């Protein structure tokens, strides 16, 4: 709908005036013109707004004559309109509002969806200073009866059927919106002329629009289908067509009636106390202050959560990377008191502090500022928690914290380690079993060193850190069943003593195997050497003092031990409750030597060269018993080999043999007799048998 000529002329003048006033820095409305289709509009009055008054007038441009704006008279209300002014910083927010409400339109209009507007007026908002007009805002009001969201919507809401019981798409081949799909005869967008072109080639079945066809298992389908078997009347299904197996075949329920899911329910932020009746596996551990006992943990997304609750009987070993500039020490656990209602008291953690020796293992990319006057700060690099549990309670908590002293302004990346273990209260030590009785995959190989007082140990490999030097490498245990290769670098100078280099290499390699015996089983007793403990076989142990070739040439050493090969023989040793138990039959270590020569560039500078040394672990599985050799029949007639064919005829009666241990033998016999009865009935009801009976009768 266009404006009348006077209003259009006034609009052009106001637009030109507003642009010029903005350039001159005078009062101006932004925007100078508004088309209003709702109950309220707002504009900004910018410039020198001190002492400015705002007035509102309804323009009646009948007979092509517009009234002269009355400035200086405060008039912010009319019979149907009101204007409010909210002051701001060198700006006034001017809001014009319709006072009657849009319900007035629906009460006066019989057709709420009429094409003609309900309100059609022109408003003029004027800003005056010292009784003189300074700026104008022209508002063209054009409001329809159904233009507001507050209008009552029609009750004819489209009901989306539940696709579990009714197909949402009655025409699955209708793939293109607003166009006719060829060969889709159920497409409503196809005209009759187009449908005649491919009526004989329409899609059939569910895709063609027959979304509720009678499926083959219906009893009614057997009466119209030829060649149905004789047993069909006994096993057919009596079901209405509405219960079809094609429901959701093409539409998988992307739109369905909304149901409140569990994660949308209001979540109480207060900690739930699970300790009143004892802990269950997975329950968070509570403190006496009704709060969770938290230790930093790593989420599934890889982020480190500082306030993650500790779950009962859940062990974990995580590492968190933190920027030292953003690091904040957690509240000390010395004051933490764990709730233990079942024992009628409180469990206080026993904390032991140790100083970290090598900071290069924990802090990388370090940058220490020259600020000697600042006091150092203490950071925790490792925290080990041992929880002793008894039934559903916690009886003891032992904590060992490794801390380091760094500069207060030191920068870098710190890697923290947090270990939590739950042990039974009657366990004599903190060592865990690696299986019961056989080893479990991924558990540490248990070892003993009878030459030491504290003889409990394990076999290790290197875990490099930083530059990969052996001086900064840490140890990690050898896990059962995992073949691993690890190594580190030795710094060697051009004037290195070969004998001392061999001693250093042998010492580094021997540090991985600080044991004399390994456990044959995962539950071998550390206190009883005869309880399945095997002595480690050491082959070709080098003599560091022997120099095979005395040479005065610098930068060359022969027969340097550089590789340690650890071979572990394992085998299956029976089964417990159907689970195969594996044990260790022997462990052998063997050294390999290399000839080292200093690598020079253009010139041999006095810089340290790097000698790589490595260690490998190989688990070799051998059969507990030698397999029986194949017979000539098994070699020639492979169709009876169950390992080469999908159908295994020799195992047809396997459930009734003594080798089947899935259930009791008596149950297998009973089920077999029942199956034989069904086969006999099927034989009597079959078509050949009925013919024989008719022939005799």
UniProtKB/Swiss-Prot annotation:
Membrane topology classification? Single-pass type I membrane protein
Decide whether keyword Phosphoprotein is in the record.
no
**UniProt cross-references to Pfam families, sorted A to Z:** TCTN_DUF1619
Question: What keywords would UniProt list here?
Answer: Cell projection, Ciliopathy, Cilium biogenesis/degradation, Cytoplasm, Cytoskeleton, Glycoprotein, Joubert syndrome, Meckel syndrome, Membrane, Signal, Transmembrane, Transmembrane helix
Role, per record: Component of the tectonic-like complex, a complex localized at the transition zone of primary cilia and acting as a barrier that prevents diffusion of transmembrane proteins between the cilia and plasma membranes. Required for hedgehog signaling transduction.
Q: Which family does it belong to?
A: Belongs to the tectonic family.
Q: Specify the protein name.
A: Tectonic-2
UniProt lists the gene as TCTN2
């Amino acid at each position: 709908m266009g404006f009348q000529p006077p209003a259009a002329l006034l609009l052009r003048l106001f637009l030109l005036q507003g642009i010029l006033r903005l350039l001159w820095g005078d009062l101006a409305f932004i925007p100078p013109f508004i088309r209003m289709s709702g109950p309220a509009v707002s504009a900004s009055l910018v410039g020198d707004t001190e002492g400015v008054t705002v007035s509102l007038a309804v323009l009646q441009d009948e007979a092509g004559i517009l009234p002269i704006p009355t400035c200086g008279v405060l008039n912010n209300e009319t019979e149907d309109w009101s204007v409010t002014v909210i002051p701001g910083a060198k700006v006034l927010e001017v809001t014009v509002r319709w006072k009657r409400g849009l319900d007035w339109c629906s009460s006066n209009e019989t057709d709420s969806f009429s094409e003609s507007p309900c309100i059609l007026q022109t408003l003029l908002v004027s800003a005056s200073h010292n009784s003189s007009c300074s700026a104008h805002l022209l508002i063209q009001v054009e409001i329809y009866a159904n233009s507001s969201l507050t209008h009552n919507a029609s009750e004819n809401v489209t009901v989306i059927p539940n696709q579990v019981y009714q197909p949402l798409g009655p025409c699955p081949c209708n793939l293109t919106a607003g166009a006719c799909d060829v060969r889709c005869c159920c497409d409503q967008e196809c005209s009759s002329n187009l449908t005649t072109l491919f009526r004989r080639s329409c899609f059939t079945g569910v895709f063609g629009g027959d979304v509720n066809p009678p499926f083959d298992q219906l009893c009614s389908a057997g009466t119209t289908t030829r060649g149905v078997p004789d047993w069909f009347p006994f096993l057919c299904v009596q079901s209405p067509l509405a219960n079809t197996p094609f429901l959701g075949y093409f539409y998988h329920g992307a739109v369905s009636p909304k149901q409140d899911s569990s994660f949308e329910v209001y979540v109480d932020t207060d900690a739930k106390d699970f300790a009143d009746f004892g802990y269950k596996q997975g329950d968070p551990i509570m403190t006496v202050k009704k709060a969770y006992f938290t230790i930093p943990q790593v989420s599934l997304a890889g982020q480190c959560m500082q306030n993650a609750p500790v779950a009962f009987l859940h062990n974990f070993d995580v590492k968190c990377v933190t920027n030292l500039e953003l690091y904040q020490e957690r509240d000390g656990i010395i004051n933490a008191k764990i709730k233990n209602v079942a024992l009628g008291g409180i469990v206080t953690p026993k904390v032991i502090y140790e100083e970290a020796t090598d900071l290069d293992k924990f802090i990388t990319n370090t940058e220490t500022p020259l600020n000697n006057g600042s006091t150092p700060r203490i950071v925790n690099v490792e925290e080990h928690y041992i929880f002793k549990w008894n039934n559903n309670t916690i009886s003891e908590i032992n904590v060992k914290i490794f801390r380091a002293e760094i500069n207060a302004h030191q920068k870098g990346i710190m890697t923290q380690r947090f270990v939590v273990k739950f042990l039974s209260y009657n366990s004599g030590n903190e060592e865990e079993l690696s299986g019961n009785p056989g080893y479990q995959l991924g558990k540490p190989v248990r070892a003993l060193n009878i030459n030491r007082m504290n003889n409990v140990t394990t076999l290790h490999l290197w875990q490099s850190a930083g530059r990969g030097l052996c001086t900064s490498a840490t140890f990690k245990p050898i896990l059962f069943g995992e073949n691993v290769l690890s190594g580190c670098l030795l710094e060697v100078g051009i004037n290195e003593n070969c004998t001392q280099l061999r001693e250093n290499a042998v010492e580094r390699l021997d540090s991985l195997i600080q044991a004399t015996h390994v456990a044959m089983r995962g539950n071998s007793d550390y206190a009883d050497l005869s309880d399945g403990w095997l002595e480690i076989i050491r082959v070709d142990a080098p003599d560091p003092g022997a120099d095979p070739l005395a040479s005065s040439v610098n930068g060359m050493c022969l027969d340097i031990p550089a590789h340690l090969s650890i071979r572990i023989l394992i085998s299956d040793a029976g089964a417990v409750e159907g689970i195969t138990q594996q044990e260790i039959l022997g462990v052998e270590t063997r050294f390999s030597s290399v000839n080292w020569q200093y690598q020079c560039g253009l010139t041999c500078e006095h810089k340290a060269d790097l000698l790589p040394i490595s260690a490998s672990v190989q688990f070799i599985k051998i059969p507990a018993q030698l397999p029986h050799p194949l017979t000539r029949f098994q070699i020639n007639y492979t169709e009876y080999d169950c390992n080469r064919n999908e159908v295994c005829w020799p195992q047809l009666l396997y459930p009734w043999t003594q080798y089947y241990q899935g259930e009791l033998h008596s149950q297998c016999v009973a089920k077999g007799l029942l199956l034989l009865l069904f086969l006999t009935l099927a034989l009597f009801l079959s078509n050949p048998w009925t013919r024989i009976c008719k022939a005799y009768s």
